[in-house]
Amino acid sequence: MLLKAKPVVEAIEKENSFILTPANKKYLNLAIVEVGSSDGSEGYISNIIKQCHKYNIGYQVHSFPEDVTEETVAKAVANISNNLSVSGCILMQPFPKGLNMESIKQFFSTSIDIDGTVKESIFSLLYPSMDCGYAPATAEACIRILKHYNIPLDGAHVVVIGRSMVVGKPVAMLLDKENATVTLCNSHTKNLQEITKSADIVIAALGKKNFLTKDYFSPNQTVIDVGFHCDEDGISGDVDKEVVDYVKNITPVPGGVGSVTTAVLINHLYKSANKTCILKGEA
């Protein structure tokens, strides 16, 4: 079965409708910071902007050339963080080499971190009582898809391929909270095919086009393909197309994780706007 994004997105949109009020609506303002550009990032930003137009969300895109100074980006991030009308900000990653992202993140307020970028947001995945920031949107999108389609997580063996702080590690933390048994694999993992074949669920987030062929899977598995590659051959994921008809469940590319990720970001923005409204005593 194809685990399509549309019904998951519709469920998130319904959730958003219960969050939105006349009081918090005025705080629905999003900032996007981009340094340099790529086809992937431009497409991602374009999708977010479409959603902003759809829901009448204010937005600003702060674009900088690759040779921008670290001081300039840090100053822009600090100004955004201090702007009380902004409830959400996305730092497009990765930054070009030469820019110290960790240094820039010091100026980024956790309260508007709707994509789980700063360390405090990641800590909150380990310590929910901290209640600061949000999970990285792509990692949360994977969980939302699995839950929407009633794929059992409690006790399931989930293999995550890729250990980035954007997807791999945070999705492993989220799965652990669901009582799944998680195996986190990377480029140094030995006997990867044996490991992936033994899983109930495989989450592919390695960033290599069509890398995972049918040889990596078993017929009764659920596969979440996070990869997104756009070139002259069209759009592909990390999982080869031949796997679609081989496994039990799989997310399509396109029309899978990416669309849900955008919906999750908007959901985080709604929640952040509501928190801002409450803090100002306007709820």
Task: Outline where the language-model segments fall.
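Glycine-rich phosphate/diphosphate-binding loop of Rossmann-like nucleotide-binding domains
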Residues: 35-49, 132-216, 221-222, 234-244
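Short beta-strand elements in bilobed, periplasmic/extracellular small-molecule ligand-binding domains
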Residues: 52-67, 182-184
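Anion-binding alpha/beta catalytic cores of soluble intermediary-metabolism enzymes, centered on
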Residues: 2, 90-153
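Short glycine-/small-residue-rich Rossmann-like dinucleotide-binding loops
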Residues: 94, 206-208, 227-228
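Positively charged, low-complexity intrinsically disordered leader regions
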Residues: 1-26
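Short, well-structured alpha-helical segments in soluble
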Residues: 72-84
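Short beta-strand segments enriched in small/hydrophobic residues
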Residues: 27-37
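Rossmann-fold NAD(P)-binding glycine/threonine-rich loop
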Residues: 104-122, 224-279
